Design a protein with these regions (language model features):
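Eukaryote-skewed repeat-based solenoidal scaffolds used as protein-protein interaction platforms
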Residues: 114-266
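N-terminal alpha-helical scaffold/docking segments in eukaryotic complex subunits
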Residues: 1-116, 282-334
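A sequence-composition feature that detects small, non-aromatic residues
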Residues: 55, 66, 70, 74, ...
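Long, repeat-rich segments with strong aromatic
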Residues: 223-318
């Protein structure tokens, strides 16, 4: 059994080994071995944000200012508009709220508008990135049974995808060191997340695996990221999906398959890794004893759904070798 810091070191070493060309075919199995060293933890009290109403009023204040600027067609550089750092901290904390009016239509909508309309300074964007990829955000209560920390984890990743998009298409505010840290943290998060809930009654969306798809799609679009790093990220997503024992019922598998098949069409290296992984999944089914627990059956059906989503993508959207293999093995549960 190991602690989170040790797992992070093992994943960092794996990433370097993939870069060096020392690991490829065994990447999934090595990740699996590392993940299995992390013991599940008992449920503990989740710390939730306070001051939701006050944060909402601050969001409304800034949104009103931004709307007035837009109506007057003012040039941003000529207007004294600035979100106070203290308010930004207050608002981003609401991403962890179980209440959608503070989290989803509140903090997420607000941050999305601020990022897309270039209303945060580069310093604030860098701070926001560091905040969202911190252990306290991405790994909060992640080894425990289902809990309210899922909102903190999932919406941190969702906003990260917006920051990565902005960094790629507008001003590159992230340093190489920060980008590397983002890749390390997101990869480990994708491998560790086990909460597959989509829409949760009055609390609204959690949707972690769709958000994983979004942020990973942005990582795959990084123009200067070497192929070995993209293989590592791909491996982490597939390793995490392999371990998932909860159903994904709100389109998450479709989104993941869309992102994975798209990158796999970009270079044969990614297609080879995807095909290798699918063959290992199929081999596990043939060689292992039949599932006996609900967890084992759910893992089996999750992988089956993954196969079927590849077929639904269509032959033109999937590498030929991958599509042909999945077509032959489409009776995955037989």
């Amino acid at each position: 059994m190991i602690e989170l810091d040790e797992l992070k070191k093992e994943f960092t070493t794996l990433r370097q080994n993939v870069r060096n060309g020392d690991v490829f075919q065994s990447l999934g199995e090595l990740m699996k071995e590392s993940l299995h060293k992390m013991p599940p933890q008992s449920l503990t009290t989740v710390s939730l944000p306070v001051d939701g109403e006050f944060a909402l009023k601050r969001m409304q204040h800034y949104t009103q200012q931004a709307d007035q600027m837009a109506e007057s067609e003012a040039v941003i550089e000529n207007v004294d508009f600035q979100v106070k750092d203290s308010d930004l901290t207050l608002i981003v904390e609401q991403l962890a709220s179980p209440l959608p009016k503070y989290r989803d239509t509140g903090a997420f909508f607000f941050l999305s508008d601020m990022i897309q309309n270039d209303l945060l300074s580069e310093e604030q964007l860098r701070w926001l990135t560091d905040y969202l990829v911190s252990d306290e955000q991405l790994f909060a209560h992640i080894l425990e049974p289902q809990n309210d920390a899922i909102y903190r984890r999932s919406f941190s990743v969702l906003v990260l995808s917006l920051l990565l998009f902005s960094n790629r298409t507008k001003t590159a505010f992230m340093s190489e060191t920060q980008l590397n840290h983002v890749i390390d943290q997101v990869s480990l998060y994708a491998a560790l997340e086990r909460d597959g809930r989509g829409f949760i009654n009055e609390n609204g969306w959690a949707h972690a695996f769709t958000h994983i798809g979004n942020v990973v799609a942005e990582i795959f679009l990084m123009p200067d990221l070497v192929r070995s790093d993209k293989v590592f990220v791909l491996g982490a997503v597939l390793a995490g999906f392999h371990e998932l024992s909860q159903p994904l019922t709100f389109g998450e598998t479709e989104r993941l398959v869309e992102v994975i098949t798209h990158i796999s069409k970009q270079h044969e290296l990614y297609a080879d890794y995807l095909l290798l992984t699918l063959k290992i999944w199929r081999k596990d089914l043939v060689t292992q004893t039949p599932p006996k627990t609900q967890q084992q059956w759910q893992q089996l059906y999750n992988r089956s759904q993954f196969f079927h989503e590849i077929l639904l993508r269509g032959k033109n959207e999937v590498p030929e070798a991958v599509f042909d293999y999945v077509s032959v093995t489409k009776n995955y549960l037989a």
